[in-house]
Amino acid sequence: MREYASDRVDLRSDTVTQPTESMREVMASAEVGDDVMGDDPTVNQLQDKVSKMLGKEAGLYVSSGTMGNAVAILAHTRPGDEIVAYTKSHIFRYEGGGYASLAGCSM
């Protein structure tokens, strides 16, 4: 693993973050609910805030860029469509044709 200066925050992945003790305390005391059932107040507040900021009727929180890509592709394509992506894009290089398989599209 590459070494970085100690004054940098590494946000490449949630697997390399190091929460502080105060962050852990906030997480432990946070009000939570089942997001699948629409009962998580934090997710609901975030979706409402962002949809209002963007002037949209509603928002949908997705937990990763990968999930966002999947939602977008499934919303905008039908089986048999072609997905056009830059050859150096993450979706083309690292997703291994998963989206093409998921959506029934060619890449």
PLM ranges: what are they?
Residues R2, R8-L11:
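Pyridoxal 5′-phosphate
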Residues R2-Y4, G59, R78, V84, ...:
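Structured catalytic cores of enzymes that bind and process phosphorylated ligands/cofactors
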Residues R8-V9, E31-G33, D81:
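A short, structure-level motif marking secondary-structure boundaries and short turns
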Residues T15-V16:
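Short coil/turn segments
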Residues P19-G65, T87-R93, G98-A100:
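Conserved N-terminal alpha-helix of the aminotransferase class I/II PLP-enzyme fold
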Residues V50, G68-H76:
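Buried hydrophobic packing segments
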Residues A75-R93:
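Conserved PLP-anchoring active-site segment centered on the Schiff-base-forming lysine
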Residues L102-M107:
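PLP-dependent aminotransferase-class I/II
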